[in-house]
């Protein structure tokens, strides 16, 4: 045998049968070889012929099939183990790069060779060897005699499907075997008609599925109503819920000439529409593979009309403030995709498909009917199932570990939007990290105008898409890090990318930016840019208010209480200035409107096109304020004496409660106008955190004082901290969550957690009230009498420390930021410098006394426990590295899984236990700070006291509220009230 033939015979790809040359294998050799090789070749030939004969005999009772000369060469491969078959499977088409370099290709997208060497992997070039059918090998041409015999057998089987004709079938099969042996090497006659192989396959399928119809596909005068058959199949499919066909019903309807086929019912979801199906296998269909190939999936696209509806839903609801793609270009790709046959999809369509599927997933999720109180309808369940199915298809079509182009990064971002309301935040955090690293790898963080030359320059659409995509990922990273308490992934001084151009998508073309057509109108990209600027301010708030490490120069002066107080309040004032400047620069269409206003004129001031963006921006703005003022909430909610606190801290604690109330009112207003979506994460977590603030304040500020409330700043706060008003707002917030709980899994988790808080706090409060009622009634009466006598005898005056200019400005800063009356621009600029005057902040020292007549009532209740000791309880509240966490910090940690910064954690000094004291009510841990560490004594009542805290008990044994029990319940540890876990164990984040 020549050397070339030996190589072909021994090639691992020659016996697979995928590529056949049409020549039968040779059984003799022309070159001298060893006797062993001759015997092996003879044995192989005999085995091949024997196997072929046995296969033909064993198939005598089966349906006749079209026999080809390649059967004898492939029969051995059928009986081989599956592992060998997978190893010998040959890829039918290599990528363009591998074909050019003449290297092996695994047929994947991208292939392993292009992945290793960072080549561009594409399948665009046509197949030179076979231009008619690129990528699909041509089988050897069968003999016409074989096809004729197979056709006769198929017709006989279809018309005589009973046991009486088995002899005729056997005779036909024997005739077929004889013809195969006789005509195996004969050339094809030119004038003999050849039956089509597809027609034979069609006849066999019809005979197997619908034998009663007795169709003869070889009859040139066949009378078959194809339109009626299609209507019958559609009608039967519409009646089935599982896509199973009743073949008997199809046969009966086709045989009945008078049958009336009713039209199929209208489709209720995208799952009922016509689907375009394509199997894009990687040609490595090994079932033993642990990870399936990225291309080994079944693509199920809905009809074009349904797809466009889902795309518009994603654009108008899910991506209101996230414009990271060019919509006209997207619609062009969709039109091109649906105009092509799935078998003709090229590299461009293969890269676009994952992005399209992710958009369809988000569109299905946001298409659910809002505010469904009962069990979701069947249509709602179908939408959710379709969304999950599209998400899985998108995830399978991309290699998440090797995201290397714009379409893939956009796919990951859209998957994040889908996951934020259906998975936990920790999952979103991982995907955001992948998207950000991929964007940095592609250079999206750099301003390419500095590097582009005239020969290779990006067009305006590509350039603007890069900007949009980068800033969308960056602000997602900022937001989720603020929720989870994790570090920022990228600093502002590490990128120089410009903000996207504020033009409508239609005015950004391949050639130029059409600024003249925009004419200064607000665009959707402009709304997204305003949200991006706000997220920058949120990043500054996290950096300045929640630092992980205190700078050395600031730590040196941290022992100075007045300096540390002024320093932290100076930072807050700077951040308030940033928020005020952002608010002043907003376009008129995005100016916040008063959530308490019920007049229709105020709402109509905002164009309907930008109404949803206006509300979402307002929620994001209020979220920034909550995070800004959140460290001060302990000053106004605990039972500690307000006289020891800085008035500015009290005011900013009051601001946190005011903002939380404002969020609840705004959410309720959005529900009234059907604009609030529970699937939108920016709104959902802001509402949740606001209600948690109100619940926290309502319980610890109200029940620490026997239901009377305790307003530290008196008349200055008016009704801002009124317990009854806050209780009403909590009920409104609960109603909001009732409406949103069925919108997404995140909404349902939030609803369940807050319900647990309601139940736990109410149960502990009721138990505590029964225990202390007898002892507190007389004390409360005396306190109220003294308070009334003091208020009657002395006029209510403001203390000196509240009359300071900086303290007044602290009030005005917040009120001016949340003042919804439109003022003249000049007046705003003039008042800005006055309101945020901070020149004397470094020298300001507040008085440590607040007269009793300023408070509504005297404090008559004992504080709860050590966990209620918050910042500001000693010497004006040292907001430095000795910041001590309180109840709300632990609540924050439990709910979000947020790890508190070191400066917010207690000093880990373990107290010396008294070996003679076995009282279970004693405190086991001493939460001290270095500057104010006091000794802990145990009295006969089993209550631990801190000597530096005016002998206030750290743990009240008579109090029925056990915070550890509450946190254990939130953590679902299954131990109930006997949980031994501490309050800083973390839940899995959302």
UniProtKB/Swiss-Prot annotation:
Pfam families: Fungal_trans, Zn_clus. InterPro entries: Stress_Response_Reg (IPR051711), Transcription_factor_dom_fun (IPR007219), Zn2-C6_fun-type_DNA-bd_sf (IPR036864), Zn2Cys6_DnaBD (IPR001138). Residues 9-23 have a biased composition (Polar residues). Its main location: nucleus. Residues 1-88, 160-192, 255-295, 764-800, 915-944 are annotated as: Disordered. One of its GO terms (molecular function) is zinc ion binding. One of its GO terms (biological process) is regulation of filamentous growth of a population of unicellular organisms. Disruption phenotype: Decreased hyphal formation. Residues 95-121 bind DNA. GO terms for cellular component: nucleus. Belongs to the ASG1 family. This is Activator of stress genes protein 1. It comes from Candida albicans (strain SC5314 / ATCC MYA-2876).
